[in-house]
Amino acid sequence: MVLCVQGLCPLLAVEQIGQRPLWAQSLELPQQVMQPLSAGAFLEEAVEESPAQPEREPKVVDPEEDLLCIAKTFSYLRESGWYWGSITASEARQHLQKMPEGTFLVRDSTHPSYLFTLSVKTTRGPTNVRIEYADSSFRLDSNCLSRPRILAFPDVVSLVQHYVASCAADTRSDSPDLATTPALPTPKEDAPGDPALPATAVHLKLVQPFVRRSSTRSLQHLCRLVINRLVVDVDCLPLPRRMADYLRQYPFQL
């Protein structure tokens, strides 16, 4: 006996109109057997397996602290006598061109991202190095490789005084090749020639500041410098309070 069964097309047609064929009616499977898993189940398992990484809290910047730090630096620089304000790189070059090596001054930077620039006479002529400000500290601008070794200071005068003392120690040392001051690049803003040329490294030597003629330092200030060079702590001196306060207003040797 031969059993005749309808082809696929009729079966498909029957399924399309909603009638189930006889061979399918005998297979009564529960509807929940083949339900797919949601993608969220896999994601939840993956999240549970991997430990959560602690988020780094962003460093809070105190605007008032920055303002006080910058104001204190400006106050120190005005007292120093070797802060030249808003002169240009060309004017600084003219002032330092005939000065001995190691003569320096501090001026306002022409770059909008920097506050100050250190102009110094080197063996290659007047050179300008920007002074960075970040996190209430100042440091000399440098390339990425030497930046981790560059020290930071609470004000510009402390920064300059440190490198002046380092150069003086190098001069007194028996090893002339010992270099305490780092090799720093010439900023693009003040580099001679094409500003697109890459900055080149130069070894700084800070010896003496170039004092402005218009800001002649008083005899009191010169005496204060001598006292600061000879005395570590002015509080130990038997001085009147007013005189001690005057010494604290500029606790530097330059």
Curated annotation (Swiss-Prot):
Cellular component annotations (GO), alphabetically ordered: plasma membrane
Domain SH2: 82-188
Occurrences of domain SOCS box (ranges): 205-253
InterPro entries referenced in this protein's UniProt entry, alphabetically: CIS_SH2 (IPR035887), SH2 (IPR000980), SH2_dom_sf (IPR036860), SOCS_box (IPR001496), SOCS_box-like_dom_sf (IPR036036)
Source domain of life: Eukaryota
Record's keyword terms, sorted: Growth regulation, SH2 domain, Signal transduction inhibitor, Ubl conjugation pathway
Pathway this chain belongs to: Protein modification; protein ubiquitination
UniProt GO MF annotations: cytokine receptor binding
One of the GO biological process terms: protein ubiquitination
Sequence segments annotated as region (Disordered): 171-195
Oligomeric and partner information: Stably associated with the tyrosine-phosphorylated IL3 receptor beta chain and tyrosine-phosphorylated EPO receptor (EPOR).
Task of the protein: SOCS family proteins form part of a classical negative feedback system that regulates cytokine signal transduction. CIS is involved in the negative regulation of cytokines that signal through the JAK-STAT5 pathway such as erythropoietin, prolactin and interleukin 3 (IL3) receptor. Inhibits STAT5 trans-activation by suppressing its tyrosine phosphorylation. May be a substrate recognition component of a SCF-like ECS (Elongin BC-CUL2/5-SOCS-box protein) E3 ubiquitin-protein ligase complex which mediates the ubiquitination and subsequent proteasomal degradation of target proteins.
PANTHER family listed in its UniProt record: CYTOKINE-INDUCIBLE SH2-CONTAINING PROTEIN (PTHR10155:SF9), PHOSPHATIDYLINOSITOL 3-KINASE REGULATORY SUBUNIT (PTHR10155)
UniProt note: domains: The SOCS box domain mediates the interaction with the Elongin BC complex, an adapter module in different E3 ubiquitin ligase complexes.
Name this protein carries in UniProt: Cytokine-inducible SH2-containing protein
Natural source organism: Bos taurus
Gene, per the UniProt record: CISH
